[in-house]
């Protein structure tokens, strides 16, 4: 059984930055450091940071006065920032810069009074944060997930409307919804550049290229990771059996029966150590040659805040 590794896979620049912010804050200020929501959606990463002294909370009222709090990579609503400011909490913002770009687009629409549509999954932290950038009561902010949602959408002024997308969705998902929006609202304006992030796009492209070469695709990532779920769905859509696993212990031998080639990739919030453990386990189960599939090289780096840079 050959093992094919997707390239690129695993950590993106936004995740790397978010984790570095928490680690640097712990190193500089000591524990506890409070983090609003899981800094990234990966159980292994979160548990490691907990062991180092990070305390994960869902709301700021769980954070004691005079504490340091970090906002997760998914971003937060304006009301959360305002609450942190009113309590004089020391804040470090680990919001991915690509999510911040979407926030700025929504803020501009709100300021102008244009209505805005967000393509995203209800309840996802990034979606909650992005929806929370719109404050204009005279306008409107709407969430859609499918073309059917678009068909039911009623807006106040279809001539002054824009859309943005959740960064971790699949390109296939958003294209259908965008087509529906443009058909129903011919004057709708989109972002100057696609909101789907480079890492999401690259990892999806790698899976799309590999899926036809393997019998089974393993996606390393947590179940609450949006981009990891999209990778599994994409592999299945292209025609490969696919499984989302937190780690090597979740591999079931029945998946490998009759398999000549197996693919391995990882969501943008999954560390490489988990991938290496999966490879080791596959070798124990009969895997031999490990081949890294050619893909797009990534050299994007997002800097941590100056105050947290360790010299």
From Swiss-Prot:
[4Fe-4S] cluster binds at residues 12, 96, 197. Dimethylallyl diphosphate binds at residues 41, 74, 124, 225-227, 269. It comes from the Bacteria. GO terms for molecular function: 4 iron, 4 sulfur cluster binding; 4-hydroxy-3-methylbut-2-enyl diphosphate reductase activity; metal ion binding. Binds 1 [4Fe-4S] cluster per subunit. InterPro entries: LytB/IspH. Its cofactor is [4Fe-4S] cluster. Its EC number is 1.17.7.4. The active site is at 126 (proton donor). Isopentenyl diphosphate binds at residues 41, 74, 124, 225-227, 269. One of its GO terms (biological process) is terpenoid biosynthetic process. Keywords: 4Fe-4S, Iron, Iron-sulfur, Isoprene biosynthesis, Metal-binding, Oxidoreductase. (2E)-4-hydroxy-3-methylbut-2-enyl diphosphate binds at residues 41, 74, 124, 167, 225-227, 269. The keyword Iron-sulfur applies. The keyword Iron-sulfur applies. Belongs to the IspH family. PANTHER family: 4-HYDROXY-3-METHYLBUT-2-ENYL DIPHOSPHATE REDUCTASE. This is 4-hydroxy-3-methylbut-2-enyl diphosphate reductase.
């Amino acid at each position: 059984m050959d093992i094919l590794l997707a390239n690129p896979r695993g950590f993106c620049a936004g995740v790397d930055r978010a984790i570095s912010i928490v680690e640097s804050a712990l190193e500089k200020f000591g524990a506890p450091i409070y983090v609003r929501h899981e800094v990234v959606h990966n159980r292994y990463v979160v548990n490691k940071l907990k062991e180092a002294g990070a305390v994960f909370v869902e709301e700021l009222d769980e954070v004691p006065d005079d504490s340091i709090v970090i906002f997760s990579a998914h971003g937060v609503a304006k009301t959360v920032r305002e609450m942190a400011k009113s309590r004089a909490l020391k804040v470090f913002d680990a919001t991915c810069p690509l999510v911040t770009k979407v926030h700025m687009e929504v803020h501009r629409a709100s300021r102008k009074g244009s209505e805005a549509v967000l393509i995203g999954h209800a309840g996802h932290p990034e979606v909650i944060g992005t929806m929370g950038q719109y404050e204009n009561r005279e306008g409107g902010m709407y969430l859609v997930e499918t073309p059917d949602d678009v068909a039911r959408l009623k807006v106040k002024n279809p001539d002054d409307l824009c859309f943005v997308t959740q960064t971790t969705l699949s390109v296939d998902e958003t294209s259908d919804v965008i087509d529906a929006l443009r058909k129903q609202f011919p004057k709708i304006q989109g972002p100057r550049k696609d909101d789907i992030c480079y890492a999401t796009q690259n990892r999806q492209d790698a899976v799309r290229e590999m899926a036809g070469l393997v019998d089974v695709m393993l996606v390393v990532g947590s179940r609450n990771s949006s981009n990891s779920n999209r990778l599994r769905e994409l592999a299945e859509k292209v025609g490969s059996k696919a499984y989302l696993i937190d780690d090597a212990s979740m591999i079931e031998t029945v998946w490998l029966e009759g398999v000549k080639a197996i693919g391995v990739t990882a969501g943008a919030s999954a560390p490489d150590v988990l991938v290496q453990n999966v490879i080791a386990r596959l070798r124990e189960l009969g895997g031999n040659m490990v081949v890294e599939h050619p893909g797009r090289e990534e050299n994007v780096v997002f800097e941590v805040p100056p105050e947290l840079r360790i010299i």
